[in-house]
Curated annotation (Swiss-Prot):
It comes from Aliivibrio salmonicida (strain LFI1238). This is Flagellar P-ring protein. It is found in: Periplasm; Bacterial flagellum basal body. Belongs to the FlgI family. The basal body constitutes a major portion of the flagellar organelle and consists of four rings (L,P,S, and M) mounted on a central rod. It holds the Pfam family FlgI. GO terms for biological process: bacterial-type flagellum-dependent cell motility.
Length: 373
């Protein structure tokens, strides 16, 4: 298909670079396309494999599946154990090996891997991962892993059974421990369009991105498909396409502000409030009741020459304290900062604020989403 990118590459690139520099200077505070989106089809892939770690100083395991894996490995080297023989493999551990294959990873490149025990091994420190095939979702082998583990954790056991464990000794890493043997096909060089997918879906942001690209390249070169995707017409020639994408992904534009949200982590008490959250007219009162129970043990001691027995009795002291909650009244249009400030002035805990937020949302007094994680 013929488009405005079919003319001379050098002239094309010079024009793009000059335009990009002008836009970068004029919109220095805006976001680049590459910072808020990713190219469709350009993605990483997860790989996984099952293997053995050997050379452990007695911290390995002797589980049935480890023994089976060890015997299978010996058979691959032509070693056949006598029937009924059970090897003592305290220096061997069964492990799972995982890694992420980056986009455009080429044959012969290396990637980091993570090795984790799947059995009862006490520690992987000092071990060596034996050759392990790493496969993708399609069952094909894309990388082969092997190497010496680096384990940050430690484990020590005393003769009396006491044990000290620091960090996690059953998980280790090997830097550059896997070599890529098969490349993953990429759709990057196919078709007449490049699609950018926003990291945070938003209709306004998608339209603004398309408008910015059209201002940069010319009319009708980009269009917003939906709240996530923006499709840009691109040259078919792969060398031109790389230069084209390099210029387009550095175009600056102003993303839309996110929708009004309140994120509450009920486990840690963390509360994050978006700047567009508003309150409607509401009155809030929140009081707390504290129940304290103290258990005191009383000992009844009989006389020295009596036939009585020493008896321990329980004496419970229960105290109930209720705080008188203050009432807060908010006018419509106030931000959540006003609520947080008012609650903090009376020394309320984060749990109190979470309860107030939930009640306000149920009453329809919060203009925004309340998300509890």
């Amino acid at each position: 298909m013929t488009n405005r990118w079919s003319f001379d590459v050098k002239k094309n690139l010079v024009t793009l670079i000059l335009t990009w520099l002008c836009l970068s200077i004029s919109t220095a505070q805006a976001a680049r396309i590459k910072d808020v989106s990713e190219v469709a089809g350009v993605r990483s892939n997860q790989l996984i494999g099952y293997g053995l770690v050997s050379g452990l100083p007695g911290t390995g395991e002797s589980t049935p599946f480890t023994d089976q894996s060890f015997n299978a490995m010996l058979q691959n080297f032509g070693i056949q154990l006598p029937p009924g023989t059970k090897p003592k493999t305290k220096n061997v551990a069964a492990v799972m090996v995982t890694t992420t294959l980056p986009a455009f990873a080429k044959q012969g490149q290396v990637v980091d891997i993570t090795v984790s025990s799947v059995g009862s091994a006490k520690s992987l420190r000092g071990g060596t991962l034996l050759q392990t095939f790493l496969k993708g979702l399609d069952g094909k082998t894309y990388a082969i892993a092997q190497g010496n583990l680096i384990v940050s954790g430690f484990s020590a056991t005393g003769a009396d059974g006491s044990k000290i464990v620091g960090n996690n000794p059953t998980v280790g890493r090997i830097s550059g421990g896997a070599m890529v043997e098969r490349e993953v096909p990429s759709p990057f060089g196919r078709g007449d369009f490049i699609t950018f997918n926003l990291l945070d879906s938003d209709f306004t942001t998608a339209q603004r991105m398309a408008d910015a690209v059209n201002n940069f390249l010319g009319p009708n070169m980009a269009s917003a498909v939906d709240a996530t995707s923006v499709r840009v017409r691109a040259p078919r020639d792969i060398s031109q396409r790389v230069a084209f994408l390099s210029a387009v992904e550095n175009v600056n534009f102003d993303p839309a502000d996110g929708s009004a949200k309140i994120i509450v982590n009920s486990r840690t008490g963390t509360i994050v409030v978006g700047k567009h959250v508003r309150l409607r007219a509401a009155a809030v009162t929140h009081g707390g009741m504290t129940v304290a129970i103290k258990e005191n043990q009383q000992v009844s001691q009989p006389g020295p020459f009596g036939n009585g027995k020493t008896v321990v009795t329980q004496d419970s002291d229960i105290e109930v304290t209720e705080k008188q909650g203050k009432m807060f009244k908010f006018e419509p249009g106030l931000t959540l900062d006003d609520l947080v400030r008012a609650v903090n002035e009376v020394g309320a805990a984060p749990s109190d604020l979470m309860a107030i937020l939930q009640a306000l949302k149920q009453a329809g007094a919060i203009e925004g989403q309340l998300i509890i994680i």
